[in-house]
Amino acid sequence: MLLDDLDQSDDLVARDPVGELGMVAAEMLQREVDELILGLAADDLAALACDLPGHGWVSRAIVGSRPFAYVDRNVGVRLERADNTYVQLCGRFVVELRGRRVEQRFPSRQGRVLFAYLVLQRPRAVGRGELIEAIWAGDLTANRASALTVLLSKLRAAVGADVLAGRGSVYVVLPPDARVDVEQALAALHRAESAVVQGEWARAWSAALCARYVTARPLLPDHDDLPWLDLWRRRLDDALDGALEAYAAACLGLGGTEIAGAERAARRLLEHNPLRETGYGLLMQALAARGNVAEALHVYERARTVLRDELGIPPGPAIHEIHTALLGRHG
């Protein structure tokens, strides 16, 4: 199950159960590659190798099974559920409603912000005053109430009145099986952390990688900073830390060739958050597992220096315990 790099598609789609990466990471990456859409079945569907021309992909969908439709394109193969509803807010903005891509019909940048805000507020109905604040962040230089009315009308025309509902207060309605990347990532992180606690390393590995793949991409990157966006971005930054931590722990638990993945994830965690003490502990364990005990001890010294200089604290008990064990091995 070794993943050499997060961007290597073959490893991403071929080495995990359908219910995790297939539902989020594979779909996101597939959309990056020549607009291919990979529709996947329920969690318990068996894997079936299906080579995509020109890309070496291995997908895990049963091509002949309903409700899949096979479409041969010049750029590859399209496997799509006819009723698929998917919203991607991290990285490239994608909205697919019942198998139709509709984000190109959105009225403006504000239309994307409006839809994203309502999606993340589901199922709550949002008042117009709150929507004005979410879109324009206190900029009342123009008649924002009228502008919001026009924006809602155009967005409703793009997605349908059954999706964008309400008048005085507005809310988005998506099917029960709709997939929203942000929600899937946070749910996957919860599963990963739970699996780590229980020592279920394979389950933790796939869930953590799913969360990691989404949270590594910026939320609505083409939009100016807004207070609510800043809050969500910080939340997803924290989730990325958690996903990298859970992934490294899962790789350590699996052992073998996965140890290299643990080291890479721990290093990425420390690059993203140098004050994350668990990152130092995971990196020390990964290096020691690969026989690099001396380097692991150097990591401890680095942790001690960073924590002292930045926070004025010594390493905590967990990392100190790892250090003590390594000293015994090194001696």
Regions flagged by a language model, labelled:
Residues 95, 115, 131, 155, ...:
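Conserved RecA-like P-loop NTPase ATPase core
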Residues 23-70:
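Polybasic, low-complexity intrinsically disordered segments
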Residues 125-133:
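Short acidic, hydrophobic short linear motifs in intrinsically disordered regions
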